[in-house]
């Protein structure tokens, strides 16, 4: 259970804590809609294909497409995926650093210190790079009842984006809705 993000960085949004558009709380950016996929085959619709009636890579004719879809088929031949995307450029780096500095003031200093100990690649949150931080959050949660997990989750996402921008100059990101 939970929603994922992927692209130049990857991970999972904190369940019940973090929205799919949390990037917008770090920098001034608006999400782009997700990809469109053809019904039937699931291929991604290219922008110049939006006026087509079926995927021409997978079907020889509209009739072949309709045969597979069934005679009851109505509506658009493609669906929008339940995702949003961001193309973050290094123009946002200064604003991101300012946001991270503000977040640090709201987070238990032990957690910030643990995050700052990470000197390796943070692009893949599934690699265990945040394991020490996660364990510390669990310990501190037992001490403090009203710790703002949303701020901690946002800070971790922001650090991933920051490292990606510093390394690549941009950060492309898809977020599951």
Model-inferred region functions:
Residues 1-167, 175-177:
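Acidic (Asp/Glu-rich) sequence patches and key acidic residues
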């Amino acid at each position: 259970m939970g929603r994922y993000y992927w692209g130049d960085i990857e991970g999972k949004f904190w369940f019940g804590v973090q929205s799919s558009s949390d990037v917008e709380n770090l920098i001034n950016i608006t999400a782009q809609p997700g990809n469109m996929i053809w019904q039937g085959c699931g291929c991604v619709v290219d922008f110049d294909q939006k006026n087509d009636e079926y995927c021409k890579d997978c079907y020889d004719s509209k009739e072949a497409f309709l045969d597979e879809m069934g005679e009851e088929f109505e509506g658009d031949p493609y669906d929008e995926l339940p995702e949003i995307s961001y193309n973050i450029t290094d123009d946002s780096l200064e604003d991101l650093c300012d946001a991270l500095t503000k977040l640090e003031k709201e987070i238990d200093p032990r957690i910030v210190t643990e995050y700052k100990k990470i000197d390796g690649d943070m692009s893949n949150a599934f690699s265990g790079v945040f394991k020490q931080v996660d364990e510390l959050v669990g310990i501190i949660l037992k001490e403090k009842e009203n710790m703002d997990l949303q701020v901690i989750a946002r800070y971790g996402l922001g650090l991933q984006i920051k490292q990606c921008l510093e390394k690549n100059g941009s950060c492309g990101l898809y977020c599951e809705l």
